[in-house]
């Protein structure tokens, strides 16, 4: 197996910072994450979360599936003019989009509708034709969800990924009936046929593997394990010219969305799959996970591979014309590219999922690609040197190097889920901001949905959360399973508590990733049935109830204070405490006040720091945040631009932890919040509401 890296192409540039998210005087747009957008090409507005695209057989049109917060739709783009010429609504749509071999019909996955929608297509116009239900029940369940769709090469049968049933449904397009089902890996993402039609490949989002199935019976020919979250695939037949003669006859490129890698599997004449190469798309040699390669496209001559790197807002370019892949560079895109396609004239079309746009980009020559690559690097605040020296400077409690000690020995991280509170309903929030530091320019990453919680605990939202979140948020699919046992939802390096456990730190969990007992089974005071993350099994407070809007936060605070009293008796408190206070209003504010007061009056206060962050705020807007500690500055307003990744990185440095992703690694540390000499005056909570 060979390893190819794009990081070695790029030189170091000066880190730049800005003061407010939005258009920047330095060019482009500054994001709340501290990254910048300077997309190449022409930007065409679409709807929300454009996530897949297909070029018509005649090359004149590009169809785009929009599956975000707005009502789902299919956009038709004119390739010649690079403009949207039509948009057709659908009941639901998620990833699957394909033309019939003749190009006169289009098939769209119906997502939570558990159906496939058929349209006729003529001269750029879509007309609804038929609906192919994949279940017989009147109302589909959350498990009945259609993802990718693909025709066999002969155009006779349509194959559909049943995402939460871990199966492939085979539909006869003449009758619209399901004629067969095949089991496959967990969370089948993409279906790709072998050109001979005798077999097909399925990327398993949850298993980190690609499954190779025989076409007629669906029997498993083979399986190859790759990296986390394999998503898109691209097929390249033949062996490149050269003296080396490999034992494979074709290559299968597979994007690993929870890594910085694209995997290259060689297929032998005997149908064996072997990992022959890994294409690393990192911008620098030591960059942590966070590139999120999630979509692939080959150029018309099959010499270039384009790789959509979603979280890096870039497309990586690699030369695959030889036996060993050669990295060429990057192209800057709009925010969160989800798909890439190449037109007949070699222009590159990129869908920008978070921006809701399509970029039409002329094929860059070597000079232009070099300039584009430097732009991509300049757009990121991350640099490898930050892993060994965060640059926090001397005299404060935040170490600059991973192994340096801190004056702070206990970190308490409290995640809220409300917006900026008013003073009448939140006197403790406002009093804490007045007595300690008022963070006037703090931003939550990821927005108010599930993404915000992932950014606040894992320094990234996995591609599963990004792509499934809108469907659940708009209740097209009932319920949600983000992290609560969902095998495809895990982030690249786990969560803050995973990081701490790996480093051997003592840990206590209050309310994260737990299954609650039914209220009628809590007479003994036990609120938690079990932890949903194995790491949390032995460190979770059983009397601290998880998310349940009907349960008061004040009761949660009292459960914590009861354990704090036990810590006082033993003289031992965990080095990291993670706590979820999910409610809002006066109850929540009183609970926070009691927690802070309890810690501030305890023996642990001289070495404690309490970090409070709100996650349920639109990204780019100010979010509630507090830092309460003897080492926090007193009575000041801080206008430094910080975000949830900044808070995570600051806690990591205090605790001696490595960063989880490129986003906390490159985040601005909250050095201006702290002072070198401690002020141990305690905090007195405002009186809580009645019990």
Task: List PLM regions with ranges.
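Generic recognition of cysteine residues
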Residues: 4-5, 309, 541
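Predominantly soluble domains enriched in secretory-pathway, periplasmic, or organellar proteins
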Residues: 13-397, 404
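N-terminal pro-sequences and low-complexity stem/linker regions of secreted or lumenal proteins
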Residues: 377-691
